[in-house]
Amino acid sequence: MKKIMVEYIWIDGNQPTAKLRSKTKVVDHEVKSHLDLPDWGFDGSSTRQAEGHFSDCLLKPMRIIKDPIRGGDNLLVMCEVFNSDGSVHKSNKRAKLRELAEKFKDEECWFSIEQELSLIHI
């Protein structure tokens, strides 16, 4: 099997404006889904997501996208950040969104346009 470069991408803890971070892992197996990729740790103190004395954070793959720069079978991996114990990290806003999306998945979305007109006699 040929080797594939997977770029793990996540949102850091910078305030007031978070930034994107990434690091690359090389795998030698086929990746069809984000579930085919392992969780990966990182030092949260360098991304303002943890204190220096207990800085382990965890990246969990959530989506894969074909890498438009490297091409081939290489992938971009969109990740969420978790604490080392597996709990949701405070910088992980997407986890709450997933929870709400699951809760309301059977609801229908409706969108409409309201057009207002004014007639003025001059």
Describe each PLM feature range.
Residues 1-120:
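ATP/Mg2+-dependent ligation/transfer catalytic cores
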